[in-house]
Design a protein with these regions (language model features):
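Domain-level signal for soluble alpha/beta catalytic cores
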Residues: 1-240
């Protein structure tokens, strides 16, 4: 089974939850999601003590972007500020740190500035608690150009985040199926001084929303990840 279990916390911060009028429940959401994942990780570790399981809290990009305007008529407009996003992430990460999470994973990164807000929040939590938590960064690229939605190449992304001392791994998630992801993983493995992660989709959805890759197809492609320098493998959309 899995070595790392993901807590269901992807959108559990008040920026995303405000759309559903549930922002006042984010502390409870994170605490409960982490508890469920922690209990399962500990149960599996007891069954196989030679293979400890770890819990990662997934932290999504929110439904806002700091680098781009949501208003085509006003390109200078931003839906939120860097400080507002930092505060929302810090609130979420503080609960997770206090609950004993093993790893933070900032994933589906499409805007590097959003990711930098997450890194800043993690640093503040570390300063407040004295607890250092390793960070996984997982980028999603927009198309075959290999750039994020905000226009950065993977090289540029790495240059933007390498100042942070707590980064444990960088990688890719979503974007493509496993085979199509491989060229971009090679770019990361050649340039990044970290472990490399990959969480591909099960292909791309068809017109009915069904993902086209079977487990056997994904497994065959993922075997090649070893040659691409990948250390951590999971799945994204359509893979469960």
């Amino acid at each position: 089974g899995a070595d790392i279990i993901t807590a269901n916390t992807f959108s559990a911060q008040r920026i995303s939850q405000a759309d559903y009028q549930t922002e006042d429940y984010v502390v409870e959401m994170n605490r409960t999601a982490l508890q469920i994942a922690r209990e399962e990780a500990e149960r599996m570790t007891r069954l196989t003590p030679n293979k400890p399981r770890y819990v990662v809290a997934t932290i999504g990009p929110t439904n806002r972007t700091l680098s781009m305007s949501p208003d085509v008529e006003n390109p200078a407009y931003r839906a939120l500020t860097f400080d507002q996003l930092c505060e929302a992430y810090e609130e979420q990460m503080m609960v997770l740190s206090e609950g004993g999470v093993d790893i933070f994973m900032l994933e589906t990164i499409f805007d590097t500035l959003n990711a930098k807000a997450g890194l800043m929040a993690a640093r503040r939590v570390k300063e407040r608690t004295g607890r250092r938590i390793p960070i996984m960064l997982s980028v999603t690229i927009a198309d075959a150009s290999g750039r994020t939605l905000s226009g950065q190449t993977l090289d540029a992304f790495l240059a933007s985040v390498q100042h942070d001392e707590d980064i444990f791994s960088v990688g890719l998630n979503c974007s493509f199926g496993a085979e199509d992801m491989r060229p971009y993983l090679r770019v990361l493995s050649e340039k990044a001084p970290y472990y490399i992660s990959a969480h591909p989709n099960a292909g791309l959805p068809d017109e009915e929303g069904n993902y086209t890759e079977t487990p056997e197809m994904m497994a065959a492609a993922i075997k090649g990840f070893i040659d691409d320098g990948v250390n951590i493998v999971g799945g994204c959309c359509g893979s469960t």
